[in-house]
Swiss-Prot record:
GO terms for molecular function: isocitrate lyase activity; metal ion binding; methylisocitrate lyase activity. Homotetramer. The gene is ACU-7. Its main location: other. Catalyzes the formation of succinate and glyoxylate from isocitrate, a key step of the glyoxylate cycle, which operates as an anaplerotic route for replenishing the tricarboxylic acid cycle. Required for growth on ethanol or acetate, but dispensable when fermentable carbon sources are available. Also acts on 2-methylisocitrate. Its cofactor is Mg(2+). Keywords: Glyoxylate bypass, Glyoxysome, Lyase, Magnesium, Metal-binding, Peroxisome, Tricarboxylic acid cycle. The lineage of its organism: Eukaryota, Fungi, Dikarya, Basidiomycota, Agaricomycotina. This is Isocitrate lyase. It comes from Coprinopsis cinerea (strain Okayama-7 / 130 / ATCC MYA-4618 / FGSC 9003). Belongs to the isocitrate lyase/PEP mutase superfamily. Isocitrate lyase family. NCBIfam families: isocit_lyase.
């Protein structure tokens, strides 16, 4: 065997040993270690995000063992990241927030993932570079402390693992892999990716969501894992499903999606698209077209195929219990499988009219009936390829979270779950009292939701203090700044009160003095710096 072949074989064996570690006990890969090694370069690169990924895995493993959650929120900037580091274990980077505040094109907009694909990775880098800087700054400051000062000054872990929003992957499988590579290079410990179609992606709490087939999303998850493996990192992937509230799907090609696709049960209706094209040709627009579509949908009596089969069997005289058994038997079967079972096992004589093509939209999408059962079905299909599973929901309903967790854990015991504590929910109108709200994240933790996050808390907290301060500053001038900001910073011990020190001026002085032999007449924090005023109230 040539030395090149021997080196290749040795690396393959190393990857195979790596995959047998507890870290990947629940991970399924449809490719081999040789596939991975053949796609690597000859220079081994060590990525800081791998350290962060391992740290995140260890953190969540401990929470899973204890039935507790790690909860966080979406950070906008380095200021928020440094303040979060004192109290929270992870950092979230939101695509929604990036879309409105940090697009790499500088063009803001809603959460449609129509910003350049490097937008969220760039925000991750922005925050990760700040984490690294404040970690260095702290270490330098502690190196100058006495033993007593060290003992009385808690260490802040600025290097909190970052989990970021990969939307739908921004394109095909190679686009997903390139996006994943950017996230690894920029410092993300993990990413989440959702099962929406890329061209029509919406915020999880908007209408009009279009799903992709189950296998298409599995392919995305596999692409992420493959890219991780090629780079030799243990970063995490979160599989999100938007199927709880989805109403459309791009294709009926995947048998596993069949039970949730709706069809027309009215044989007298022409296809909806034909009706709409004809109406447009007649000059109808806007509300007129919407009324025509609404009327067609009502007349079509859309049903899932198991429902149509159940009605047909009942019409043929079957008992209620027999019909219920049929529904239970075919509820997760493909269309041809359901027909075969209904005929052979239940004696159905006539297959009912049921047409899933007739209601298709002008874009060609199929009508889809989402819900919690659907989300469980999809999550269970994604589980072997993801580290965590997330069902996007419309409201903070603990009973629904319990149903989802039970449905997943019945198939995949111990599977880690994630939960969006969304600010899109009207929490005050959710039927939760103050005690319920305080306990919510910990109750979810008991169910296996080991990682939870408020996607836009950074945005909302920023908006809140900005509005409050601007309003009062306009009326009362510096009194507003002192009362709402400076005195409150001092009261809670916020380190940004002394913003020169927070920004690293002492650290920069130390760098300069290291270069110049310990003396600098231009030290930023020398005599005359106004920050010395903050040693006491004026």
């Amino acid at each position: 065997m040539s030395s090149e072949r021997a080196q290749f074989a040795a690396e393959v064996a190393e990857v195979e040993r790596w995959w047998k570690s507890p870290r990947f006990a629940r991970v399924n890969r449809p490719y081999t270690a040789a596939d991975v090694v053949s796609k690597r370069g000859t220079i081994k690169i060590n990525y800081p995000s791998d350290v962060q990924g391992k740290k995140l895995w260890k953190l969540l493993s401990e929470h899973a063992k204890n039935g507790t959650p790690s909860h966080t929120y979406g950070a906008l900037d380095p200021v928020q990241v440094t303040q979060m580091a004192k109290y929270l274990e992870t950092v979230y980077v939101s695509g929604w927030q990036s879309s409105s505040t940090a697009s790499s094109s500088n063009e803001p907009g809603p959460d449609l993932a129509d910003y350049p694909s490097n937008t969220v990775p760039n925000k991750v880098e922005h925050l990760f570079m700040a984490q690294l800087f404040h970690d260095r700054k702290q270490r330098e400051a502690r190196s100058r402390m006495s033993d007593a000062e060290l003992a009385n000054t808690p260490v802040i872990d600025y290097l909190r693992p970052i989990v970021a929003d990969a939307d739908t992957g921004h394109g095909g499988l190679t686009a997903v892999m390139k996006l994943t590579k950017m996230f690894v290079e920029k410092g993300a410990a993990g990413i989440h990716i959702e099962d929406q179609a890329p061209g029509t992606k919406k915020c999880g709490h908007m209408a009009g969501k279009v799903l992709v087939p189950i296998q298409e999303h599995i392919n995305r998850l596999v692409a992420i894992r493959l890219q991780y493996d090629i780079m030799g990192v243990e970063n995490l992937v979160v599989a999100r499903t938007d199927s709880e509230a989805a109403t459309l799907i791009t294709s009926n090609i995947d048998d596993r999606d069949h039970p949730f696709i709706q069809g027309s049960t009215n044989p007298s209706l022409p296809p909806l698209n034909n009706v709409m094209v004809e109406a447009e040709a007649q000059g109808k627009t806007g509300d007129q077209l919407q009324a025509i579509e609404d009327g067609w949908i009502k007349a079509a009596n859309l049903q899932l195929f198991p429902q149509a089969l159940a009605q047909a069997l009942a019409n043929e005289g079957a008992s209620r219990s027999t019909v219920e058994k049929l529904v239970a038997r075919v509820s997760r079967l493909s269309w041809p499988q359901a027909v075969a079972v209904a005929q052979k096992e239940f004696g159905l004589k006539q297959v009912p009219y049921w047409n899933w093509d007739a209601p298709r939209t002008r874009e060609g999408y199929y009508r889809y009936q989402g819900g919690t059962e659907c989300a469980i079905h999809r999550a269970n299909a994604f589980a072997p390829y993801a580290d965590l599973l997330w069902m996007e929901t419309k409201k903070p309903i603990l009973a629904q979270a319990k149903e989802f967790a039970a449905g997943v854990h019945a198939v995949h015991p111990g599977q880690w779950l994630a939960y969006n504590l969304s600010p899109s929910f009207n929490w005050e109108a959710a039927g939760l009292n103050a005690q319920d709200m305080q306990a919510y994240v910990w109750e979810l933790g008991k169910l296996g939701f080991v990682w939870q996050f408020i996607t836009l808390a950074g945005l909302h907290s920023n908006a809140y203090i900005s509005d409050l301060f601007a309003q009062n500053f306009a009326k009362t001038g510096m009194k507003a700044y002192v009362e709402l900001v400076q005195s409150r910073e001092r009261e809670i011990g916020c380190d940004v009160l002394t913003h020169q020190k927070w920004s690293g001026a002492d650290y920069a002085d130390s760098l300069i003095k290291t270069v110049t032999g310990g003396v600098s007449s231009t030290a930023a924090m020398g005599a005359g710096v106004t920050e010395s005023q903050f040693t006491s109230k004026l």
